[in-house]
C-alpha cells in the first residue's frame, strides 16, 4: 500500500456543503496509473491538494511517503517571466544543466533544448507544460500528480504530450494520479479510475471492471436518428450524449444480434469495451439515482 484515504472531507470557509466528501476507503498501490475524472467543480483539484497536504481536511490519509516523495504538476504553475528558462531551471533544481545527465535526458526527450534561451513569458502553452513536466519528472517521486497537464493545448500538441508521458513512464514503477477531463487521455494513460461528482466519490476501481459494471461487456454506438431509434427500440440503452444511441451488450451473443441488425440495415456503428465517457455518464447517473433514493428515505 502506497497511500490510503479513509473517509475524507474538505470544506472551504463556512460553506455548508463540503467541497469534497469521500465516504469509503481508497487505496493507491505502487506502480498504478490512476485517472481522476469529474466535471468542473467535482472536487478533483481539491482531492489532489488534500493528498499533498495543501488544504485542511477531516478524515485520514495514511502513507509512509514523506512530502518530498510526492511531486505535482498543478493547473497553475508560474515562474519569473523575465528570466531565461535555463536560469529558472538551474536555480530551482540547484544544478548545472551541463553536469546533470538526467536533466539533459529529459530536455532531449521533450525536445526542449531550443527553449532554454527564451524568457519564460515567451514560451507557448505547450512549451510551458513541457517545462513544468520536466521539473516534476526531475523529482522522480514515487507518487506524482498531473492536474490537467494538457489543458488549453490544441489537439495535436495534446496528443503528442500524452504519448510522450506514456512512453516515459511505461517501464517505471512510479504511481501516477492523472486529473483530466479528456476521456481519450485516461483511456490511454489510466488503468484505474476515481470518479467524482459534485464533491462526492461515485466509484473507484479498475477501468475495465468499472466499464463492465456500468455498461456491460461491450457497447454499440450509432447516430441518434429516427431510423436507428426504431431499429434499436427493443435493445437495452445506456445514457449517452444526445447525438448518439448506445446499446449495452451483456454477452457476445447479444452483441452479434445488435450488430447483425445494424449491418442488415446498412447503419454505421462503433463498438467499444472501454469508452470512459459512456462509463462515466452511466456511473454518475446510477450514483445520483441512489443518492436521490437515500434522500427520500431519510425524509420519510
Where are these regions (language model features)?
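Catalytic Walker B motif of ABC-type/P-loop ATPase nucleotide-binding domains
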Residues: 144-147
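Q-loop/switch helix immediately C-terminal to the Walker
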Residues: 76, 81-96
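A short, flexible loop at the N-terminus of ABC-type nucleotide-binding domains that lies
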Residues: 1-5, 9-24
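The feature captures the beta-strand-to-loop junction immediately N-terminal to the Walker
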Residues: 37-39
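C-terminal coupling/interaction segments
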Residues: 250-300
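Conserved ABC ATPase signature
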Residues: 119-123
Amino acid at each position: 500500500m502506497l497511500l490510503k484515504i479513509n473517509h475524507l472531507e474538505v470544506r472551504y470557509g463556512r460553506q455548508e456543503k463540503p467541497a469534497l466528501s469521500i465516504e469509503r476507503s481508497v487505496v493507491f498501490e505502487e506502480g498504478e496509473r490512476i485517472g481522476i475524472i469529474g466535471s468542473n467543480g467535482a472536487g478533483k483539484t481539491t482531492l489532489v491538494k488534500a493528498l499533498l497536504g495543501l488544504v485542511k481536511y477531516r478524515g485520514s490519509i495514511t502513507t509512509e511517503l514523506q512530502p518530498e516523495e510526492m511531486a505535482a504538476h498543478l493547473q497553475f504553475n508560474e515562474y519569473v517571466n523575465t528570466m531565461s528558462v535555463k536560469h529558472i531551471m538551474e536555480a530551482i533544481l540547484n544544478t548545472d544543466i551541463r553536469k546533470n545527465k538526467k536533466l539533459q535526458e529529459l530536455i532531449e526527450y521533450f525536445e526542449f533544448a531550443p527553449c532554454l534561451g527564451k524568457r519564460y513569458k515567451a514560451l507557448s502553452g505547450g512549451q510551458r507544460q513541457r517545462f513544468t513536466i520536466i521539473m516534476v519528472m526531475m523529482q522522480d517521486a514515487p507518487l506524482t500528480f498531473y492536474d490537467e497537464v494538457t489543458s488549453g493545448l490544441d489537439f495535436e500538441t495534446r496528443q503528442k504530450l500524452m504519448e510522450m508521458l506514456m512512453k516515459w513512464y511505461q517501464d517505471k514503477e512510479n504511481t501516477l494520479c492523472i486529473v483530466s477531463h479528456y476521456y481519450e487521455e485516461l483511456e490511454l494513460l489510466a488503468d484505474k479510475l476515481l470518479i467524482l461528482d459534485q464533491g462526492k466519490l461515485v466509484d473507484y476501481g479498475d477501468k475495465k471492471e468499472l466499464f463492465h459494471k456500468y455498461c456491460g461487456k461491450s457497447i454499440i454506438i450509432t447516430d441518434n436518428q429516427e431510423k436507428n431509434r426504431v431499429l434499436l427500440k427493443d435493445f437495452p440503452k445506456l445514457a449517452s450524449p444526445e447525438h448518439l444511441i448506445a446499446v449495452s451488450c451483456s454477452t457476445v451473443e447479444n452483441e452479434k444480434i445488435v450488430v447483425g441488425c445494424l449491418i442488415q440495415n446498412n447503419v454505421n456503428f462503433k463498438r467499444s469495451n472501454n469508452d470512459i465517457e459512456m462509463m462515466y455518464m452511466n456511473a454518475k447517473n446510477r450514483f445520483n439515482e441512489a443518492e436521490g433514493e437515500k434522500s427520500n428515505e431519510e425524509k420519510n
